Amino acid sequence: MMSAKDMVKVMIVMLAICFLARSDGKSVKKRAVSEIQFMHNLGKHLSSMERVEWLRKKLQDVHNFVALGASIAYRDGSSQRPRKKEDNVLVESHQKSLGEADKADVDVLIKAKPQ
């Protein structure tokens, strides 16, 4: 059987543990939920950053393509691929004139800053 002195020591140790733990009445599950939410937000942020990086690379490719003076493809789906290596030279008389919507797209792409 425990004496009163031993019981007081146990109570003091228990009080010290409870005081130093500082749970403030918050359950551990609440912290686990916030950690899960943090990881979810981090995952969304990382996937968003991947998409932004992919889009930046694609816009850079398009910007480089337009900056080199390459012709814009026809919208009716016809192919403008050169059949021979010599056909890769651009000739102004064969280039398609840009419509209003195409000009706006090209303006935006030209103004994009490469990084």
From Swiss-Prot:
GO terms under cellular component: extracellular space
User: Positions of the region Important for receptor binding?
Assistant: 51-69
Q: Where in the cell is it found?
A: Secreted
Question: What are the protein's UniProt keywords?
Answer: Cleavage on pair of basic residues, Hormone, Secreted, Signal
**Which InterPro entries does this chain map to?**
PTH, PTH/PTH-rel
Propeptide per record: which residue ranges?
26-31
Q: Could you tell me the superkingdom of the organism this chain comes from?
A: Eukaryota
UniProt similarity note = Belongs to the parathyroid hormone family.
Q: What is this protein called?
A: Parathyroid hormone
Q: Organism, per UniProt?
A: Bos taurus (Bovine)
